[in-house]
Structure formats: structure tokens, C-alpha cells
Design a protein with these regions (language model features):
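Cleavable N-terminal signal peptides
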Residues: 5-6, 16
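N-terminal signal peptide c-region/cleavage motif recognized by signal peptidases
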Residues: 11-15
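Short, low-complexity N-terminal intrinsically disordered segments enriched in polar/charged residues
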Residues: 17-39, 47
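Compositionally biased, proline/threonine/alanine/serine-rich low-complexity intrinsically disordered stretches
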Residues: 18-24, 65, 87, 140-143
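Short solvent-exposed beta->alpha transition segments
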Residues: 42-91
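Exposed beta-sheet edge and beta->alpha loop/turn motif
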Residues: 85-143
């Protein structure tokens, strides 16, 4: 009985590590962000930013207004870079190409990356903190 309990304790951290979000989850978060924007679900898109949207640098109203002239948008998210770690925090960069069509028909193409952030499991009481969230964006227009 004691052996089974000891083995369960040893296996528990391994199981927790297996459930941690990985690089593909970060890429999926960027794709989910643009899917939400495309369907006009700006509340969900805003919520994918770190700190409940605050990391976007905008209020929700300003964030939503920023897409007022956008008819369509899509993202091509490439393979994320290496995960960086520090003090129970994780960061990862996802390279992207973003394509937008404005309501006036003008097309835009941006290239750059999103940096995503998460907290390792067990550090925050809020389980949502362990999922990837957008932390910053570096996008430049492609001519």
C-alpha cells in the first residue's frame, strides 16, 4: 500500500508536466485570436491577451474600434521558437504573416511575431494563467 502511494506521488508531477501547454498550443492561441476577430467576437479576442486584455495596450472599446474598418483577416502562424523560462513564467514567440481586407477593398499584409506568456501550473490560483496569452506583438507592413 505504501509503495503504491509513493509511486502515485512520484508520478503526479510527471502527469502535471505532460499537461502543460506546449509550443503548438501557443500557435493555436494565435490562430484562435484571428479566428475570433474574423467572426467579430472581439470579447474573446481581447481576452486572449495577457492580464484580461490589458497587455494589448488598449481598453476593450478601443480594441474593438481598431477593427471597425476590417472586413476580413487571417493569419499564417509558423512554428514557434524556443520557449524561454524564468521565475515560474514561460514566454514563446510565434512568427506570423497577417492578411487583412478592409471594408473599402484595400488589402494589407503584415509580417512579424507575437510573444505569448503563461505561468507554470501550481503558481497561480487562477488556472487560466497557465494557458498561453498574447503578451506583445511586433508587426510591420509588407509592401
Amino acid at each position: 500500500m505504501r509503495l503504491a502511494f509513493a509511486l502515485a506521488l512520484i508520478a503526479a508531477p510527471t502527469a502535471a508536466l505532460a499537461q502543460e501547454p506546449g509550443p503548438q498550443d501557443a500557435r493555436d492561441t494565435v490562430q484562435a485570436y484571428y479566428a475570433a476577430i474574423e467572426r467579430g467576437d472581439f470579447r474573446t479576442a481581447y481576452g486572449l491577451w495577457d492580464r484580461g486584455g490589458q497587455a494589448s495596450g488598449k481598453s476593450f472599446a478601443s480594441f474593438r474600434q481598431g477593427f471597425a474598418s476590417t472586413a476580413h483577416s487571417r493569419v499564417e502562424a509558423r512554428n514557434p521558437g524556443r520557449e524561454d523560462a524564468g521565475m515560474s513564467q514561460r514566454w514563446i514567440t510565434v512568427p506570423v504573416d497577417v492578411y487583412a481586407t478592409l471594408k473599402n477593398g484595400k488589402r494589407q499584409h503584415f509580417r512579424g511575431s507575437y510573444t505569448l506568456h503563461r505561468v507554470v501550473p501550481g503558481v497561480s490560483a487562477n488556472r487560466a494563467d497557465t494557458r498561453w496569452h498574447l503578451s506583445s506583438a511586433k508587426l510591420v507592413a509588407v509592401r
